[in-house]
Amino acid sequence: MDDFSRDTENFVCWLKTTAEIEVSPKIEIKDLCCDNQGRAVVATQKIKKDETLFKIPRSSVLSVTTSQLIKDYPSLKDKFLNETGSWEGLIICILYEMEVLQERSRWAPYFKVWNKPSDMNALIFWDDNELQLLKPSLVLERIGKKEAKEMHERIIKSIKQIGGEFSRVATSFEFDNFAYIASIILSYSFDLEMQDSSVNENEEEETSEEELENERYLKSMIPLADMLNADTSKCNANLTYDSNCLKMVALRDIEKNEQVYNIYGEHPNSELLRRYGYVEWDGSKYDFGEVLLENIVEALKETFETNTEFLDRCIDILRNNANIQEFLEGEEIVLDSYDCYNNGELLPQLILLVQILTILCQIPGLCKLDIKAMERQVERIVKKCLQLIEGARATTNCSATWKRCIMKRLADYPIKKCVSIEKPSKGNSLTREELRDVMARRVLKSEIDSLQVCEETIDKNYKVIPDEKLLTNILKRKLTEEEKSSVKRPCVKK
């Protein structure tokens, strides 16, 4: 028996004895490494909807309240819950179990079925050359290495303050060790609600009316629950909670030999790779691409032959004008980037911004006005465009400008490299470099596909009217022949 199988067998034994987890005879842990899925939970018999797959007592959940560190140093509990936070606290608790207690830890068999550091593919483990494979995805701005290094330094300081045998661990707790434990928590932890134990009896009735004031979330590792692979389209089980235990329950009938899937949240492939180190090869149900504000500005400059200074003035007014903020009920419409979903959905703020800027570029003499007069005109245009978009209408040039925005964003992508992405076949073991390359291309394909779907969104979901009609309404007069000729009707090449 190899180490992988032995660790799995010991873990299953630990689940039923030490952890006292009740496991249905209809499921088993299976080795799917040949399919690049590691360990997985598979049905050995047909499971009906609402059946309980396993039941976990809260005492077998690893958190800052159940760790041996808190038992050995009771004063840390309040600090971790109220100052350090359960995230950093849980990292410290796990480090204590793994490095100080080692085989004496209650959780030792559990730790041995965690992914090994060499198997981790979350983006924090990628080197600079590998991260370049993900350009131009904005996921590169969300990796958070700087914040992670700051947390690592805080944790070393906390360990030294605890003292005793534990303080010696601080000298060898390198960033890579920290990143490993932090990524395990990010990938597999659950947030469990807990009641604020500091509430006294006299306040109980009042605070029960304000439940959110009392509820807090505890970052927790849940044995076996974290063994389920996740898929946004195949999710067939869900973790439920009560005061004494947690239950994994079937969301639908699960056939014999079918894998049991959970879901990590409504994440696109880029976020699945960043957080958890994997991608969904057929694309995530929640994939999206992102159009940049600079793409919109460049598209407008090309379409209307306007200059950057004028557009910057318009955008500054849209950002800072108090009356406009009131019209929009505090909703920001000027963002650095805008999500474009794989079902063709666009944020209303995005369409409104493109419509407003498109009209501003066509108002005669607007750029010659002083700032106060220009602000008044922009306020009026925002009102008119808001009414237009809320009525599911947009102008011809808004639609054309939007298509040009998409074209500009797509031009940043290596489209030819991402046309066809094949899922690694069973038994075809890829090197780490090969796997990361194909996962990066799958992320880019997800974003490209989403952007392409959104190109026709305005034409499909809005009644497109001539710009001249809206301009006449705004100016309260018909356009002169000269003004009519200056109203652009851009042709966007396919």
UniProtKB/Swiss-Prot annotation:
GO cellular component: nucleus
Source organism superkingdom: Eukaryota
Major location (coarse): nucleus
InterPro entries linked to this entry: N-lys_methylase_SETD6 (IPR011383), SET_dom (IPR001214), SET_dom_sf (IPR046341), SETD3_SETD6_MTase (IPR050600), SETD6_SET (IPR044430)
Binding-site residues, S-adenosyl-L-methionine: Y264
GO-annotated molecular function: protein-lysine N-methyltransferase activity
Signal peptide feature range: none
Function: S-adenosyl-L-methionine-dependent protein-lysine N-methyltransferase that monomethylates 60S ribosomal protein L42 (RPL42A and RPL42B) at 'Lys-55'.
Family, as annotated: Belongs to the class V-like SAM-binding methyltransferase superfamily. Histone-lysine methyltransferase family. SETD6 subfamily.
Protein name as catalogued: Ribosomal lysine N-methyltransferase 4
Provenance organism: Saccharomyces cerevisiae (strain ATCC 204508 / S288c) (Baker's yeast)
Lineage start: Eukaryota, Fungi, Dikarya, Ascomycota, Saccharomycotina
